[in-house]
């Protein structure tokens, strides 16, 4: 008969996996409770960071249709269940790992793909959604201003030519 606590933990893990749009797996061995709490606070409300048994996590991941993470499930594992912006969470975790060598990024999962630790760190170097949209809007605004100048140039040239002709005729008369 299954242990009731494990059954409840399994259901909770599966629910967290199904509610997350991405996850990051870390090894937390050597971190103090205070450091773990600091990481949780830095991650914010869109990310739930919790410790899980590897065997339960494997079962929950399989039930949730998530594959390719088994190789990362060795040693103590803490999982960041990310509901918000994955890039922002990856930045926080990567910076924390740089500052606290005891935190090791094992890998992750995003958009249906298992990620290596290097891929998680590469995602952390990307601009977040808001920054990317701002850059795109700025580029579009600049392009539209240039296009408007190009389209207005012939009309402006024609007006100047007509004004010059009018001035010339007025001077001749």
UniProtKB/Swiss-Prot annotation:
<keyword id="KW-0687">Ribonucleoprotein</keyword>
<dbReference type="GO" id="GO:0003735">
    <property type="term" value="F:structural constituent of ribosome"/>
</dbReference>
<protein>
    <recommendedName>
        <fullName>Large ribosomal subunit protein uL10</fullName>
    </recommendedName>
</protein>
<dbReference type="GO" id="GO:0006412">
    <property type="term" value="P:translation"/>
</dbReference>
<dbReference type="InterPro" id="IPR043141">
    <property type="entry name" value="Ribosomal_uL10-like_sf"/>
</dbReference>
<comment type="subunit">
    <text>Part of the ribosomal stalk of the 50S ribosomal subunit. The N-terminus interacts with L11 and the large rRNA to form the base of the stalk. The C-terminus forms an elongated spine to which L12 dimers bind in a sequential fashion forming a multimeric L10(L12)X complex.</text>
</comment>
<keyword id="KW-0689">Ribosomal protein</keyword>
<dbReference type="InterPro" id="IPR022973">
    <property type="entry name" value="Ribosomal_uL10_bac"/>
</dbReference>
<dbReference type="InterPro" id="IPR001790">
    <property type="entry name" value="Ribosomal_uL10"/>
</dbReference>
<keyword id="KW-0694">RNA-binding</keyword>
<dbReference type="Pfam" id="PF00466">
    <property type="entry name" value="Ribosomal_L10"/>
</dbReference>
<dbReference type="InterPro" id="IPR047865">
    <property type="entry name" value="Ribosomal_uL10_bac_type"/>
</dbReference>
<dbReference type="GO" id="GO:0015934">
    <property type="term" value="C:large ribosomal subunit"/>
</dbReference>
<comment type="similarity">
    <text>Belongs to the universal ribosomal protein uL10 family.</text>
</comment>
<keyword id="KW-0699">rRNA-binding</keyword>
<comment type="function">
    <text>Forms part of the ribosomal stalk, playing a central role in the interaction of the ribosome with GTP-bound translation factors.</text>
</comment>
<dbReference type="InterPro" id="IPR002363">
    <property type="entry name" value="Ribosomal_uL10_CS_bac"/>
</dbReference>
<dbReference type="GO" id="GO:0070180">
    <property type="term" value="F:large ribosomal subunit rRNA binding"/>
</dbReference>
């Amino acid at each position: 008969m299954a242990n009731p606590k494990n059954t409840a933990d399994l259901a909770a893990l599966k629910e967290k996996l199904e509610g997350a749009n991405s996850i990051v797996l870390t090894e937390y061995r050597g971190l103090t409770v205070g450091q773990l709490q600091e990481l949780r606070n830095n991650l914010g409300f869109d990310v739930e960071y919790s410790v899980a048994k590897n065997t339960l996590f494997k079962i929950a991941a399989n039930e949730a249709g998530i594959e390719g993470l088994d190789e990362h499930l060795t040693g103590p594992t803490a999982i960041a269940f990310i509901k918000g912006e994955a890039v922002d969470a990856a930045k926080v975790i990567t910076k924390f790992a740089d500052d606290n060598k005891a935190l090791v990024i094992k890998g992750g999962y995003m958009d249906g793909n298992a990620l290596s630790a290097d891929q998680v760190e590469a995602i952390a170097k990307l601009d977040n959604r808001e920054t990317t949209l701002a850059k795109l809007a700025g580029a579009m605004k600049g392009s539209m201003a240039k296009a408007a100048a190009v389209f207005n140039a012939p009309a402006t040239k024609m007006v100047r030519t007509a004004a010059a002709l009018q001035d010339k005729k007025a001077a001749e008369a």
